Every structure is written in structure tokens, then in C-alpha cells.
Amino acid sequence: MKIVAFTLVAFVALAGASCPYAAPAVAPAAAPGYPAPPCPTNYLFSCQPNLAPVPCAQQAPAYGSAGAYTEQVPRYVENPSREQLQRFHQRVGMAALMEELRGLGQGIQGQQY
């Protein structure tokens, strides 16, 4: 192992001595980014922060102070009745049973006798 390492070091030293290559000087790093465009007046934003207080919504008289911050939440689905729940569970059970039978049928067909 020492012989291999010595041979490798000798080869690298010989190759480095025979090449007239000099490492280039390191160039100074350029500033990152890109120059910003001048600030025209037709942009939707401005160069300086422009913060203005926005008034809150007026309070609704019937709801007190909460009226300004709440709105109606739509309710799309009613709670299912007992009959609807039974039909749903029956359909899910039948679908699971059919899937199980389908899997058993495929298993039997795949067997060789």
C-alpha cells in the first residue's frame, strides 16, 4: 500500500513539474443581484413605504361588535337521517363484500390443478 501511495505522489509531482501551467489570480467577486430600475410613478408600488391606516368595517347594529367581522357560513349538507345512514352502510358493506368475492374469484382462477 505504501508503494502505491509513493508511486501516486511521485507521478503527481512529475506531472506538476512538467506542466508550465500557473493558476490564475482570483478575480474579485462581483456584487450579487441586478440593478434596480428607476422608480417611476406608474408602478403599483412605490419606492418608499406608504402605509395609511384603513378604517374598520362599521358595526352591524343587530349583532353588536361581532357584526363587522362575521358573515353567514353556507350549509350545503344536512345531517343524514337514520334511514340514509342505514342505506349508506349497506352500500359500503355490499361493495366490500363484492370486492372480497372478486379477489377470491381471481385467486381461484390463478391456481393450477
Curated annotation (Swiss-Prot):
GO biological process: vitelline membrane formation involved in chorion-containing eggshell formation
Pfam families documented for this protein: Vitelline_membr
Domain VM stretches: 33-70
GO cellular component: egg chorion; extracellular space; vitelline envelope
GO molecular function list: structural constituent of vitelline membrane
Superkingdom: Eukaryota
UniProt KW Oxidoreductase keyword: no
Signal sequence interval, chain numbering: 1-17
Location in or out of the cell: Secreted
PROSITE patterns per UniProt: VM
Keywords, in A-Z order: Secreted, Signal
InterPro entries xrefs: Vitelline_membr_Cys-rich-dom
Similarity-based family: Belongs to the vitelline membrane family.
Primary role: Major early eggshell protein.
Protein name: Vitelline membrane protein Vm32E
Organism in which the protein naturally occurs: Drosophila erecta (Fruit fly)
Gene expressing this chain: Vm32E
